[in-house]
Amino acid sequence: MSSTWEKIDKNKIKLSVEVDENRVEDALEQAYKKVVKQVEIPGFRKGKVPRKILENRFGPEVLYEDAIEILVPEAYQEALEEHEIEPVDQPEIDIDQMEKGQPLKFNATVEVKPEVELGTYKGLEVEKEKVEVTEEDVENELKQMQEQHAEYEDVEDGEAENGDRLVIDFEGYVDGEPIEGGQAENHNIELGSNQFIPGFEEQLVGSKPGEEKEVKVTFPEDYQNEELKGKEATFNVKVKEIKKKNLLPIDDEFAKDVSDFDTLEEFKNDIRNRLEEEAERAAEQQVEEQVVTKALENAEVEIPQPMIDQEVDNMLKEFEQNLSYQGLNLDTYYKLANTDEDAMKEQFKGSAETRVKRNLVLEAIKDEEGITATEEEIDEEINKIAEQAQQEADKIKEFLEMQGRMSQLKNEIAIRKSVDLLKDEAKVTVVEKSNDSEEETQGNTE
């Protein structure tokens, strides 16, 4: 087999492939064995017609289609590997010559992975928020835990107040018609939590156990269901139970109950350390996002549409998987959100293009710097996967090799190292954390 290629557009090439007549003959023989099973000719049992008679009766072309289906995929893949071409879409195949006793000649036109023109990616100037955990942060964390470990007691005669937890049945109506999905029984709601439509919870303040109330609300203009935006609704609500929240005092006993520490002071120190670690990770993540974003902005690449379309499909699959964790599927979501697959794909396009460009630019940096994954790093990554999957590392490695995913794993490790390079080479200025603006910490740079 021989093949050549030429560039016919920025991200499109044409492969010209010639397969020798011996391989063509082998493919024709395979095609004959398939076709003969379907042919009936008087004087011969079905499937027993000699090839020469078959070709004389129907012409040698009767085998060409099946032979081409055998030869072209094989030869196309061999040509890609020979010239180290990375296609990003299915090829357009044009058969130039297919004759018995002659080589097969065909052209394959396909869009390929684009070339990236890297800009500046070292010495990028970025900012990092100063990591600082205050006493107020620690106290807020304790209050959240206090809320989580609150105890509730039934209210027999009193009225519901903000902070109380109610068990209710409700039915919702718009223009006298039931709202789809607007009914529930034994639903838990905490007054003042703003979980429901604005105005709903407020009208239940002062209610008593066993009381039935009519609650009137207006759906917000930005409500996710298009059919309910701005609509007035009535909910028939029955208050079945009222439970009053009792907060445990934050003291040494509280620390013992909710942690492994004996004193509140020890517990607070642990919280402070954890918050500092979380804040440091968040600050580092911001630095990473900044350097990658700037590297992307400085690079130039023309992304083929098939790559964006493929990433959109990947994002839709990821979204579908996340829905499944909540017991939903795409069809149900489309109905609830009054949308469809085309609208979702359109919504994903911008993010998909950014994701594709990110991968292309980071791969280009990896190649430019000669970054690879070491055997130690590969083993470490496999051990992490094995630990998460509660499997033996050898079995995970064997599985990855069987699936042909080892090269993908190596590439992912190398890409992460490329991001680390951007961070290590960046000029980082530490700034004070502020809601309105960030003031530079004088003389404090990394």
Swiss-Prot record:
The keyword Ribonucleoprotein does not apply. SUPFAM superfamilies: FKBP-like, Triger factor/SurA peptide-binding domain-like, Trigger factor ribosome-binding domain. It catalyses: [protein]-peptidylproline (omega=180) = [protein]-peptidylproline (omega=0). GO terms for cellular component: cytoplasm. The keyword Chaperone applies. It comes from the Bacteria. Residues 163-248 form the PPIase FKBP-type domain. It is found in: Cytoplasm. It is an enzyme of class 5 (isomerase). One of its GO terms (molecular function) is peptidyl-prolyl cis-trans isomerase activity. InterPro entries: PPIase_dom_sf, PPIase_FKBP_dom, Trig_fac, Trigger_fac_C, Trigger_fac_C_sf, Trigger_fac_ribosome-bd_bac, Trigger_fac_ribosome-bd_sf, Trigger_fact/SurA_dom_sf. Gene3D superfamilies: 3.10.50.40, Trigger factor ribosome-binding domain (3.30.70.1050), Trigger factor, C-terminal domain (1.10.3120.10). Keywords: Cell cycle, Cell division, Chaperone, Cytoplasm, Isomerase, Rotamase. GO terms for biological process: 'de novo' cotranslational protein folding; cell division; chaperone-mediated protein folding; protein transport; protein unfolding. Its EC number is 5.2.1.8. It holds the Pfam family Trigger_N. Consists of 3 domains; the N-terminus binds the ribosome, the middle domain has PPIase activity, while the C-terminus has intrinsic chaperone activity on its own. Involved in protein export. Acts as a chaperone by maintaining the newly synthesized protein in an open conformation. Functions as a peptidyl-prolyl cis-trans isomerase. Belongs to the FKBP-type PPIase family. Tig subfamily. PANTHER family: TRIGGER FACTOR CHAPERONE AND PEPTIDYL-PROLYL CIS/TRANS ISOMERASE (PTHR30560), TRIGGER FACTOR-LIKE PROTEIN TIG, CHLOROPLASTIC (PTHR30560:SF3). This is Trigger factor. It comes from Natranaerobius thermophilus (strain ATCC BAA-1301 / DSM 18059 / JW/NM-WN-LF).
